[in-house]
Structure formats: structure tokens, C-alpha cells
Amino acid sequence: VTDLSAEYKALAEYRPTNKVRFVTAASLFDGHDAAINIMRRILQGMGAEVIHLGHNRSVDEVVTAALQEDAQGIAISSYQGGHVEYFKYMVDLLKARGGEHIQVFGGGGGVIVPAEIAELQGYGVARIYSPEDGQRMGLAGMIGEMVMRCDADLSVYAPKALEAIRGQTEAHWRALAQLMTALENGKAPDALKSALHAAAKDTDIPVVGITGTGGAGKSSLTDELIRRLRLDQGDALRVAVISIDPSRRKSGGALLGDRIRMNAIGPWNAGPRVFMRSLATRDFGSEISQALPDVLAACKVAGFDLIVVETSGIGQGDAAIVPLVDVPMYVMTPEYGAASQLEKIDMLDFAEFVAINKFDRKGAADALRDVAKQVQRNRSAFQTSPDAMPVFGTMASRFNDDGVTALYQALLPRLASLGLKVAEGSLPQVDTRHSTHQVAIVPGARVRYLADIADTVRGYKRQAIAQARLAREIQQLREAARMLTEGKPDKARASEAAIDLAVKREAKLDADAKQLLTMWPQMQAAYAGDEYVVKIRDKEIRTALTHTTLSGSKIRKVALPQYEDHGEILKWLMLDNVPGSFPYTAGTFAFKREGEDPTRMFAGEGDAFRTNKRFKLLSEGMPAKRLSTAFDSVTLYGNDPDLRPDIYGKVGNSGVSIATLEDMKVLYSGFDLTNPATSVSMTINGPAPTILAMFMNTAIDQNLDKFRADNGREPTADEAQKIRAWVKENVRGTVQADILKEDQGQNTCIFSTEFSLKVMGDIAEY
């Protein structure tokens, strides 16, 4: 147990006097987010407002967030290497973009060694915490020190005149963020606020207010609407997003977690177009921030084309956003209870648009009908069909969802009527008001398929026991009839009765069970010899059935049970059986591969040339080549290597860098990938389908090159096709792609879990 000094105990109990804001994240190509999640929870508990970005975040993303959120500190966990380049690049970028006062903190367990800690702190990083610091200070002490060092009022940096925020350059956005801090803290001069509201009155910038229950998917829907606006309008419009989350009443801290859901706010080809600021409700006791009217005025003066406000989760009677926005939107899910509950929801009176998100959930179609009917009642629009009400079924979590597109295409004309300058859209029109084309990974009729599997297995076992009982009784009855006939000829009628009973039972015995019993003597003979012959992929493989120990004893590789009772024999054959035979309890192959030691030639560092050299060193003189490949984190996340420092530091670090088919060919050059003694294991997750395709093409091209070398000509189309088919049948290896583990643990998933599982199924089917 750590014995903390009085100094560290005081740090652990530190509470800030100012509103301290932190941006937290795990570094680029790093999915180890357990540590940073613990740190940000302690930060929240100490009263800090935390803008959490999650894992796999580039320096540019973190710095942009810190500047727009006007945070005092950045906290980064880095467990995947490349930390020296990452942190130095962050310090450089902060200085270059007007955030030199923002303090950077980091940690990475034992990955960041003392010499590197000294180097980074000397470069300008506020503090890198080591495991020894954790032991000495305790987690709360470490976080307390971070909060104490960042406990400053940033309102002093706010601009004194409105000209500083009029414009859409990075400098204007930085000044806008600093002004918002002063407005939030109540430190902006009254004269400046009066001028701000006076200037805002002269603008015609539409404001959309998105509100709804907690967990309804407001942030994801906001992100998808912004994505469609940017795609549809050629990324010509500039958007401000104001996102509000609740403060914790006990500690004063807050998790400002909406930014983690935003995937469409980064710079595209035309550069930055979306400014985002997260606000905490603080002590206002509402779903909005007390500073929201001032913040909206600042955004209008800054000259954005559109402002989107997303509130924190609300209850049935809340509608505080309505007077502050031009277009209120209510987001809900199909789970609201009885239809009468809809009569209690205040926002259904005020919302111009209603989105029933998570439309894939049970009862969604009924919810769409009921909500549309309630909106019709609220508006007394009985001359209009409920289907024409502005109620939409959406699935914001689904790529290119037509329900979200329908909502966007209904919203855009309303925004245009309020002054938004829209061009002719490029998105095709959709003719629906809710999500369609819902293809479930597991069809509705098979959602119980795991239970079906369990039922099938239990049923099979019951059948095996019943069949074994029949086999035993048949053997017993026939043996009794034989003994009666031999011992007492006058008992012929009893003997016939026994045979009749046996025949009746034989009729109930399955054909498969009869065949197993018929083949039992042949199986005994086959395993009693010195060799066993089995066919695998049209190849006849002979295997010695005995193994001689060091003491000269002969031991059989497969020993059959010495049963004579037909019931026991059949039960064993149906429930256990020999290796390579159903139900495969002892494996799918009859015997283990011989002539190949179970070694693992593990390599992966630097580029393909270096790792190939390492493979050759490891496998030198070995008859079997069992190559096990580790890929660097850049490859694991499906990205290309780059000279940008936060990427460059991770290229070839703790794994080989593979970005192209040519890299893959170099990696395995000199190894015959279709040789039966060659096996390749690849530890890859997110981009597993792509890497597997590269490997297959490497093996195919290797054999096409071999054909050219052997025959002095190009293969014909038919010959090439036969070579491809032969390679796919004969190549050996393993793709270690456990996407469910990644979803829960290391986070190297670049597609959704559902999509990844579907692709894995498609590959298996192919």
C-alpha cells in the first residue's frame, strides 16, 4: 500500500478555485484507453470539466480541441510507442497556434523511460508521470497536482473588442473561444456584452436547437446532419456547434463527452469548416448553460453560416432551448412507455422536427405512428395525414442512413427560409421518412441461434443415449435368444419372442448408428496396425500409429476403448470418437502434423526488408517455416506511414510497417508460401481483410512468377486461374483477428463490430 506524504495527501484533496478544463485522450494508433478513462474520472471528481476524446487521437485533433475548448490542460496516455515525437509535436503545435499557455501532461506506464521523461519535460511538456510517481504520489495526488498547476482563470486572455472575433481564420476562432470562456465565467465586461448582443441582432444566421432524452443519440445525429450538410453543399458553409452537458452537483466537475461522437467536424479538403465548443450547465439547474444566449450572440457576430446547439438530456417537462433557437428539434427513442406518455412531453408541442433515433429497436414502427399522431393532435392538424407530420425514424449509428438523410432534406429548406445560403444539393433525394434497408447481422428469425445451438447439442446427446440404449437392448435380446436356443430347444417360442423384440428395436435404430456399429470392427483393425492412411485435400498421408519412447516402449498414438457392449461402443462413437471424426472432440485432423516442431518464429520491427531478414535468421536450418508476424500500430489501424511526427514515431515500432502489396511481397520474399512446411500467422485486427487479401495476392504472384521462370512464358488465362485456385487451396496460415476482443479491450477496430463480423463471415463463405 502506498504511504503518501502530507504533501501528496494535500494534493489528493485539492479542489480548484477556478473552472479548470482538461482535454483527455489516448494517443494516435493507441487503443489502450483504460488508464486515461481512470484519470478523467478522477479529474471530474476533483471538479474539472473534461472534454474526453477517447483513443486513437492525432496531435492535430487534440490541439484543435484544446484551442476551441480553451482548456487549461491536456492529459494524454501513450502506451504504443512513438511518444517522444508525439509529445514534442504537440508542444510545437500549441506554440504555433496560440496555445502556449496550455499545459501538457502525459503517462505511459513503463513504456516511457526516465531518459525520455527528462527529454520531454525539458522540451516543454509540463509533466510525464512514471509508475514510480504513481507509487509515491498516488493517483489522486498526481491528478491533484495537474489540477493545481492548471488552476488559473483564462478570462484574462479574452479579446477586448469584437473585431477580434469577426472572421473565420484560426486566429479569429481562437479569440472566439477565449471570449466564450470569459462569457461562461461571467468575467466579460458589460459594455462588451451589450455590443455583442447589439451586433448579433443585425445578423440572420439560423440557429438549430437539438434536444432530447439522455442517451437518445443526439450527438451522433448532430454529427450525421453536419456530415450531410458538408457533403451536400460542397463543404462551402461554416458551422458552429455548441454542445451542452450537465455538471455534477456534488463535485462541480463535468464530462463534456459529445466531441468524442463527432467524426465530421475535422478539416476536409477545403480546410476547417466546423467550430465546436462544449459548455457545462454549471450551477444553472437547467439543460442549458446560463451563458448560452451570450455564446450564441458571439457565434453570430463571428459570421458563421449556421449554428447548431445540442443540449444535455432532458425530462418530459423541459423545453428551455425553445426561446433561444429558430428551429427546435426533439430527439427520442422508441422506448418511451405507453402512448399516453407522449402527452406529457413538452417538446412535442414546440419541436418543428422530431427524430425517433435508434430506429432498429423493437417497436420503432409503432413509435413512429404514435408520435406522428400525437404531433398531429398537438398542432390540431387534423386535415393533414399523420404520415405528413415532421416526424422521422433515424439510425444515426448506421452509415448513409436514409432516415437521417430524409430528416436533413426536410430541415434544409426550413434553414434556407431563415437565411441560410444553400446551393443545389448533390445528395440524391430519398423517398422515405424513416430508416429502410435494415439488414441485421443476425436475422430476426435467428436472434436465438446460440440457444438453438445449445438445444441442438443437448438434443443430440439425448438421442445418442437413447440410440445406445437401443443398441444395448438389441445385443442383449439377440444374445438371450441364442443362449435360449442352444440351452433349451423347447424354449424356441421364447427365443422367437426375444428376436421379435430385437427386430422392433432395430427398426428404431438410426441408419447412422447402424453404420457406426458396422464399421467398428474395421476401425479396430485400422488402428491396430503399424500405419494409418488418411486423405486430406486429395493427398494420401501415411502416419505411424506408434511412438517409441526413450526407454524403448511402444505407445499407440490413438488407443480405442476396450468395450464389448454395443451400447457403450455406440455412445462412445457418437459422443467422443477418434480424432478427425465427428463430433471432433479430439480435433478435426486424424493426427498431428509430423516433421514440424511447434515453434513460433516471431518477428516484426522496422520495414519489410528488416523483418524479412529477421524471419530468415529465425528459420535458418529449420525444416518448417512457421512465421509469426507482428504489425506496427500504424498498420493495425489501417493507415499509411507518413513523415508527420505523430505518425512517424510509430512507423515500424513494435511491429513491421506494411502499407502496400509490394511491402507484403518483400516481407515474405525467399519463403515458398505454398510449401506444406510453411505456415504464416498474422496478428492483425481492424484491417484484417485487406492484409489477408495482400497475403493471398503475394502467394498467388509468387506462384505466377515461378510459372514464368519454369516455362519461360506468361501463363494463359486458364493456367493463371488454375494457379490462383491451387494457391488458395494450399496456402497455410492464421489470421489472428478477434474483433470482439478488440471491441472490449485494445480497440484496434477501424470498422463497427457488426460490419467486421459480417466481413469475417463473407471471407469464411468465400
Region spans (language model):
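Canonical P-loop GTPase G-domain recognition
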Residues: E119-V147, I345-G425
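Hydrophobic anchor at the beta1->P-loop junction of P-loop NTPases
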Residues: V208-I210
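Nucleotide-state-sensitive switch-loop elements of NTP-binding domains
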Residues: L183-I205, A216, L221, L225-G317, ...
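Extreme N-terminal, non-catalytic leader segments
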Residues: T2-K9, L139-P206
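Conserved Switch II/interswitch segment of TRAFAC-class P-loop GTPases
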Residues: S78-H83, F284, A302-D305, T311-G315, ...
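C-terminal end of P-loop GTPase domains and the immediately downstream helical coupling element
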Residues: V156-K160, N378-E496
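Cofactor-cradling patches in redox/metallo enzymes
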Residues: F29, I36-G141
